C-alpha cells in the first residue's frame, strides 16, 4: 500500500484537501466551502444534466407521491 496521501482540490476554492477520515468536510476544505456549494444547489445554480427534465412540467404525469 502506498504511503502517499491522496489530496483533492476543494470544488469551491481549489485548496488542497487530504483524503483522510480527519478531513471532516471532504471534498471541501471547510464548512464555509461546503455551505457555499449547498447554497448553489439550493438556488438551482447547479443541476445534474438530464434529457428527461420535462417530466416535472407535465401535470398529467404522476410522480407517485402526490395526493389527489
UniProtKB/Swiss-Prot annotation:
BP-aspect Gene Ontology terms: regulation of DNA-templated transcription
TM helices/strands, residue ranges: none
Free-text remark on how the cofactor is bound: Binds 1 zinc ion.
One Pfam family recorded for the sequence: YacG
Keyword line: Metal-binding, Zinc
Cofactor: Zn(2+)
Keyword Metal-binding: yes
Sequence positions that bind Zn(2+): 10, 13, 29, 33
Domain of life: Bacteria
UniProt GO MF annotations: DNA topoisomerase type II (double strand cut, ATP-hydrolyzing) inhibitor activity; zinc ion binding
Subunit architecture: Interacts with GyrB.
HAMAP family per UniProt: DNA_gyrase_inhibitor_YacG
Family in the record: Belongs to the DNA gyrase inhibitor YacG family.
Chain's role: Inhibits all the catalytic activities of DNA gyrase by preventing its interaction with DNA. Acts by binding directly to the C-terminal domain of GyrB, which probably disrupts DNA binding by the gyrase.
Name of this chain's protein: DNA gyrase inhibitor YacG
Source species of the chain: Haemophilus influenzae (strain PittGG)
